[in-house]
């Protein structure tokens, strides 16, 4: 009977989810559609600020990065939305000059924004804090600027191997370039710092829409769906065997016991639900195979800007997306994830997940834990955020109202989960 109830609930939810999410997320979640529509009509030129405007930042405690790049190359980055050509540049941080670097735009939809997200590429002989690349995300559509930073902090607090993230100031050719979100790149250094040294790392790509751990036909199919970030000279055989075992198993508990770091995966699922990360089902995550230590697979979060509500059409008031979103009966706007579907099909695992979700809801995803973090971030970024809004006009609006919106989301998401978790327990 519990499984029947579970299935019935799922079927009832399907139409609600599809209708609701069509309001929340448009075809912009699908890169092919995004390119067809030719985003957006915004003026790519930033507003030049008078030199004295930067005096308000004299006491800023934010890390300051400086980028020097030929003006024609900077213009190319700002106007060529989907070009991936990196341009020569020089980068300075903490008083240290990194010569021979390259810079380009990064991201998918965000490439269409006037204020581009940036990827800084370093010489392998002169890495930046151990990394060969640096991600500086735009935050142009986030009224609070800090959703990504907070999302990575929540994942880490829940016991997930997640990137470090912080707010930084960027000077470009001697002038204020903007307030950016620095996100640590998952790479060899990232893995070593999290006891995953030597792991094989795959990035779930948005190119194919199939990076949802489904079983694919051949090596070329996996190449299209996933990008290998470490051990690049090796084949995709390990990933193929994992997805094959997932598709063919008749014993879900045995599969997860053999292949997956189960506690970390439960932590990942719980954090994903807490922050309402709906954009990870078939992209925006990494898979790491820890061959040297546990012999298990780990899921690592990525691209968390569309959490705590969604900036696509500014639906930050939506805090009640379903707990089981991303499964076959309750798909998200981009589809459903095969690993999550298999996990939630097993009653024992569902109970373990709900237990952990309840625990984290009361221990980590609380106003007592998160509001002070938001207050500190708000104080630190306020002067730079004000200048950024002038330099890069857009839809995001007032920072302080944006921070209040994140706080409101947290309260409403907590209230929803406190109501919904008991309902899900009864259905099992």
Predicted feature locations:
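Phosphate/dinucleotide-binding and metal-coordinating scaffold of catalytic cores
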Residues: 1-428
């Amino acid at each position: 009977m519990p499984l029947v109830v579970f299935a019935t609930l799922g079927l009832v939810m399907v139409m609600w989810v599809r209708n609701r999410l069509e309001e929340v997320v448009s075809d912009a979640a699908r890169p092919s559609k995004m390119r067809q529509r030719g985003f957006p009509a915004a003026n790519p030129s930033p507003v030049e600020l008078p030199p004295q405007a930067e005096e308000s930042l004299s006491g800023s405690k934010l890390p300051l990065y400086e980028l020097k790049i030929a003006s024609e190359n900077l213009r190319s980055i700002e106007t060529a939305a989907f070009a991936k050509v990196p341009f020569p540049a020089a980068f300075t941080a903490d008083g240290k000059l990194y010569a021979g670097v390259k810079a380009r735009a990064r991201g998918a939809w965000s490439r269409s924004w006037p204020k581009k997200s940036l990827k800084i590429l370093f010489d392998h002989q002169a890495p930046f804090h151990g990394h060969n690349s640096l991600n500086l995300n735009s935050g142009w559509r986030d009224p609070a600027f800090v959703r990504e930073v907070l999302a990575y902090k929540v994942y880490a607090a829940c016991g997930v191997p997640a990137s470090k993230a912080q707010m930084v100031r960027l000077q470009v050719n001697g002038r204020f370039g903007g307030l950016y979100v620095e996100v640590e790149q998952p790479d060899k250094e990232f893995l070593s710092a999290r006891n995953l040294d030597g792991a094989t790392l795959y990035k779930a790509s948005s190119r194919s829409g199939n990076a949802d751990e489904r079983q694919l036909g051949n090596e070329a199919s996996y190449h299209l769906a996933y990008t290998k970030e470490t051990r690049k000279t090796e084949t995709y055989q390990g990933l193929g065997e994992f997805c094959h075992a997932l598709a063919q198993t008749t014993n879900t508990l045995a599969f997860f016991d053999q292949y997956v770091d189960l506690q970390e995966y439960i932590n990942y699922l719980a954090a994903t639900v807490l922050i309402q990360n709906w954009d990870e089902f078939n992209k925006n995550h990494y898979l790491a195979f820890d061959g040297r230590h546990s012999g298990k697979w780990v899921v690592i979060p990525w691209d968390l800007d569309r959490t705590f509500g969604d900036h696509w059409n500014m639906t930050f008031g939506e805090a009640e997306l379903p707990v089981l979103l991303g499964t076959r009966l309750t798909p998200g706007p981009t589809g459903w994830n095969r690993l999550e579907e298999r996990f939630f099909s097993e009653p024992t695992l569902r109970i373990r997940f709900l237990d952990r979700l309840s625990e984290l809801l009361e221990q980590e995803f609380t106003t007592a834990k998160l509001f002070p973090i938001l207050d500190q971030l708000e104080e630190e970024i306020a002067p730079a955020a004000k200048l950024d809004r002038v330099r890069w006009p857009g839809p995001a609006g007032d920072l302080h109202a944006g921070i209040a919106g994140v706080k409101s989301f947290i309260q409403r998401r907590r209230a929803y989960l406190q109501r919904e978790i008991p309902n899900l327990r009864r259905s099992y």
